[in-house]
Amino acid sequence: MLIGCFACQENQQDPQDTTQQQEQTQEPTDEVDRSQPQTGPFENTTNLTFEKQTVTEKEMIISEEHEYDAGNPDPVFAIGEGKAKGGLVTLNADTVANFNIGVKFNDTVTAKYEFKLTSSEPEPEANYDSAYIGLRLSGTGTAPNHESSRVWFLMKDQKIGLRTGKWPGCTMVPCPVDFSQGVRLIIEDDPVANVISIFYLDGDVKTPLAKLVILEDKLEFYMEGSQTPDITEPLEEPVEKTGYARIWTHHMRKVLKINDIKVSGETTASTTDPVDMLNSRDVFADTWVATDDVGRTTPVGNDTAAPGDKKVGIFYFMWHNASEQGQYNLYDHTAAYLSGGVDAVWDLIPQGNLGFAHYWAEPYFGYYNSDDEWVIRKHGYMLAEAGIDFIYVDATNGIIYERNLETLLRVWSEMRTEGYAVPQICFHCGNTESLAAASLTFLWNNYYSTGKYQDMWFMWEGKPLIFFPDSLKRTLPDEMKTFFTSRQSWAFTSDSWYTTKDGKGRWAWADMYPQSPGLSPSGEVEQMIVMCGFWANGSGGTNGGRSYTHKNGIPDYEGDWDFGYALMNTTSGLGLAFQEHFDYAKEVDPPLIMITGWNEWWAGRWGGGSGNLAQGQTICNEYRVDEKNPKYQWYYVDSFNTEYSRDIEPMTGGFNDNYFYQMVQNIRQYKGSRVQEAASEQWAIDIEGDLGQWYIVGPEYRDYQGDTVDRDHFSYVGNFRYTNTSGRNDFVTCKVSSDAENLYFYAECAKDITAPEGTNWMNLFIDADCNAQTGWYGYDYLINRSQADGKVSVEKFIGNDTWELETVGEAAYNLRGNVLQIKIARSVMNLGDTFDFKWADNSVSDGDVMQFLDLGDAAPNDRFNYRYTTEQTEIKLPDALTDDMIVLKAGSYNAFAGGKQVRLDASSTKAVLMGRGEDFYLPLAFVEEVIGVSCQGLETFNHYGITYVMPAQAIAAAGKVVTISEDGLVVISSSAIEDADILTTLYRSLM
């Protein structure tokens, strides 16, 4: 999408007129500031007065004619089960009703809420049948009986208190005011002190009533005058500093009255303004190489097509949803089978509550909760490096896991702010109108209509993509109808949801081979589904699992079938069904592929008694559901075990991460990939000398910065506390140089590198022959397991697939701040002009290759390697590139110019495109010599010894047009580029 364009703009000053501004040069810096000058983070103060229905900001004006109901929510105030007249809001009795304040204030200035509350509930009704005032809520639809609740006060008659414990728990204490007579309240939420103070007006006197002190691990509620807390509530997780506000009632016998409502504070733009991707950093993940446990190697460069504009999405689940540690029991079919055989599986089948989670196996990251930020970050990195463009979040059951969704959006938005293009998001609201309406209503009220996280939405045809039935679309207001690109989506294209429209406007999320394509409303092929597995309850009559193919059926096996566990160690991990699906999708070659799926992991146990919905269905090709047979009355729909499941996220044990690398392989073949950049400007490095020697050396091998954060979170099931503090030295950039005698390795970390400690401190792994079948998982040498007298060890792996090493030599090293350099004589290792390498810190130490995924840091991530080569391979230029284009990318030291790829400055990889918003910065010499625009009179500054300018206005004055994409691409050409697909192709093609 085009987000900026400069064409023939009038300059504020003539860049040729040196009398208007003298050239300035700042002092050189060795620090990279990619963000450039920041604007203020906050908008103007917002004052909302419900009674007068006026506000200070135009977009928050409340219409006199507006009907305050949940079905037609206002951007600021909305009512559910109540009415408003003038400035008085009345919430209905004997129901659940609410008044929403749909504005979120920033976390540095006190927010103020003022209103008159009349709340009465005749005794002896339960305390929880009360009026609740919620603050710092994750969404405007959050309620005190939701797992994502933050802070809720209770008020009625002459009592005040807090929502405590599990719903419907609450604690109330006597107070000196009588809410049944109406009390004018002033609530001040100070996020800096982390205190919420409650006052009441005694006549015209503002009088303290109570305060809530918010600590990291608990809430402390004090009545005025109390020296110790009157109520204490422990916290599993810290309360956010800001959020939404809501007044909510639970089956009160009398109406609740709220009058003369005033709200004030400073709104934050941090989650509504798009992330500035001119601050981004490409890590060149499509040039990384890896081989999985069955010998499949990810293709690179000329083994794939040139990068294009195709898109790939994957089904993502957020239902791993406990609100506290130890809340749910663990049922794991594969763990049961491995410990007790098939009899243990039969014993487990009837256990647990109906509909509750039975895991098919343990995820590699454990039985995590979906709001575990450490896991969310790992998912973001993994999916981005795999080439996933978007996730489609499961909202098919009418349930939005509010805390989990907000955490995912916040963390991934933070990662985009850090410069990394993690996947965007759309929602699958299912094919049942009522359930889809429930999901859509929440999403619209809390996200889409507010502009919150707007840059996170995956766009199709220029609008956010969403899935819901056509019947729902017909009932929506015009604003919502025109906001989305919607498609109807469900399983099995042989069913009526697809066939009645001949597939037009229909995209399947599940189908059997050969899959039918998803079509546009006019009938063009748009999409195809790819599945890595199917269903436990029949798979469309085939009884097939991960090993099933249309061509060969279910593979032969030895021994007992055991629910398909007979294939666990043979074909379940080969991805036979996955490959057949992907091969067919690549043959059809649609613009977009959707993959089912990433992290479903469990299925509910169903059945029991008469009226069994699955009567007669076959479960895992093992038994037929029989409601009259106690053993066979239970059924599972989606997942059951290693054969009958459909997750690509790595598992613990079993086939580990095979499906992940198989997915990477196929995505690259479908979308294309760049060739590896050949080594350039190779020369001898004095590792005791100036680090500036490395600036000219290319290429940069990059890693994600920020992937060493600690983990501390409870599990979804099993009462585990997952902690991981192994992250230590965070790799950012690596380089290699060489001469006839030596190889030189450079590793730069985000902060100063720690002192040497243990055998896994700053290890360098080398695959000398680029062959995964030799050495330990392909690695032939391991450098720096020990250090002495300015030297590090050089060890060689003995044999294949073993963690046995022998010392073959030593190498010089230099540790300086955040940089480690190693100099190795070529005579020590048998290395040619092409080899693979990997850095790792505090990671693998005993031969478990999977530990690259979660221990310490590895560069590149997981099993991936960098490839060093001196072989010059022709860059695959995109067809969209024309001779008049200058194409630049945020954080890149390369550009397309004159129909080829060139450096911005031949002397340094530190010379990159930098910018913010529509302001971008380039080396002066590049602007004048390559773009052909004079920089005379422009302000200059020095970056790593390179003179920079901000050239946009000068370029426009020269008659050229600048197009800036939301990905962080800058194109200088004779005319603006409006086609988003062209911009995507150019972005993906440039290193």
State what each model feature region is.
Residues T49-A93, I696-G727:
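Extracellular glycan-recognition surfaces and repeat-rich motifs
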Residues P144, M223-T242, W248-R253, E677-E688, ...:
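Acidic/polar low-complexity flexible segments
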Residues L162-V192, D204-L209, W803-L815:
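Short, aromatic/His-centered strand-loop micro-motif at the edge of beta-sheets
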Residues S180-Y200, P208-I214, F221, L820-I824:
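Short tryptophan-centered beta-strand motifs in secreted/extracellular beta-sheet-rich domains
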